[in-house]
Amino acid sequence: MRFLTAGESHGPQLTAIIEGVPAQLPLLAEDIDRELARRQGGYGRGRRMQIEKDRVQIVSGVRHGMTTGAPITFVVENKDWKNWTKIMGAEPISEEEAEKMRRKLTRPRPGHADLNGAIKYGHRDMRNVLERSSARETTVRVACGALAKVILKACGIEVAGHVREIGGIRAEETNYATIQELQKRSEESPVRCLDEDASKKMMAAIDKAKQDGDSIGGIVEVVVAGVPIGLGSHVHYDRKLDGKIAGAVMSINAFKGVEIGIGFEAARLPGSQVHDEITWSEEEGYKRKTNRLGGFEGGMTNGMPIVVKGVMKPIPTLYKPLQSVDIDSKEPFAAGVERSDSCAVPAASVVCENVVAWEVANALLDTFGSDQLPLIQAAVERHHAASKEF
């Protein structure tokens, strides 16, 4: 599968076109809307989320609740568009009109795409960069991931995410018996954290950041359970699934690091405390005693749950802005201020879930075919049985 997104933060809509989705997949708008609503939640979100109530329109590739195999188009309208029709419209306006609207951005925000994008594409108004580089685009990336989750669930694979850290406050109690328990407990927390004490401290830290006109980041974790052995490949660098997942996570706005399994901790431990011993039983087939490698060996899944962590930096838009330079006058000024969040880590955990789900679903279809769901499901079942008896 592949997808292409289009649209600006304050434009009329966001659009995604997805190609390669199997036919005979039951798909409803509510499957997508559920993930969109989760993305809009989480403690620390800004005023924009009070305006937008994201709902998807499925305008192609699905008929009577079933995919046809044709390209699928998702559209999500921006409710705030009505306030930006002149500013963000496609029709030309005069410089005088543009000046009156006072929405021209000439003071780049440190940590954002503003200045680099303006230099690259020759924009004197950095709004042309801001509007597309905004995390608002993750709305339709989540929609694509929601579709991927439907495919995975139909093949017995579940995805869940939670927050491990916000503003230096770490969750200590992160144990869970099943991925369903992880999903439930994460959803019950305003910051999607499994540790109740840490959740309260995280919310207090978010409140303080908001009061100080600042922002804070954190660490999220995504778990994928029920994965067949052998997704991805060792035969070439660009077919390694852990590499694809790492690249996808790093492509999320404001993400600056990624770990698979114990990640960087592996550099501090001897091999005997890093690699997972292999066992076999008639009931379960091949398993690992531990899962320090996060479900991957040689760029391929080993049947254990995939475990991925992503590091999100603090959002660069600050209500007490850092120093910048006006690109017109070259004089020092405080950076521009746009409506933003104090902390988007809980929402980012949902984005990360769906980005990882997309990569795993793609690998699943690469391995087991992609024409129609019943054939894929049968192939996955045969593979599970063959792996157990190997």
From Swiss-Prot:
GO molecular function terms listed in the Swiss-Prot or TrEMBL record: chorismate synthase activity; FMN binding
Instruction: Report the PROSITE patterns cross-referenced here.
Output: CHORISMATE_SYNTHASE_1 (PS00787), CHORISMATE_SYNTHASE_2 (PS00788), CHORISMATE_SYNTHASE_3 (PS00789)
Q: Which CDD domains match?
A: Chorismate_synthase (cd07304)
Any binding details for the cofactor? Reduced FMN (FMNH(2)).
Spell out the InterPro entries in the cross-references.
Chorismate_synth (IPR000453), Chorismate_synth_AroC_sf (IPR035904), Chorismate_synthase_CS (IPR020541)
Which reactions appear under catalytic activity for this entry? Answer: 5-O-(1-carboxyvinyl)-3-phosphoshikimate = chorismate + phosphate
Q: Which residues bind FMN?
A: 132-134, 253-254, 298, 313-317, 339
Q: Name one GO cellular component term.
A: cytosol
Matching Pfam families, A to Z? Chorismate_synt (PF01264)
Protein family per UniProt = Belongs to the chorismate synthase family.
What does the function comment of this entry state? This reaction introduces a second double bond into the aromatic ring system.
Which named protein is this? Answer: Chorismate synthase
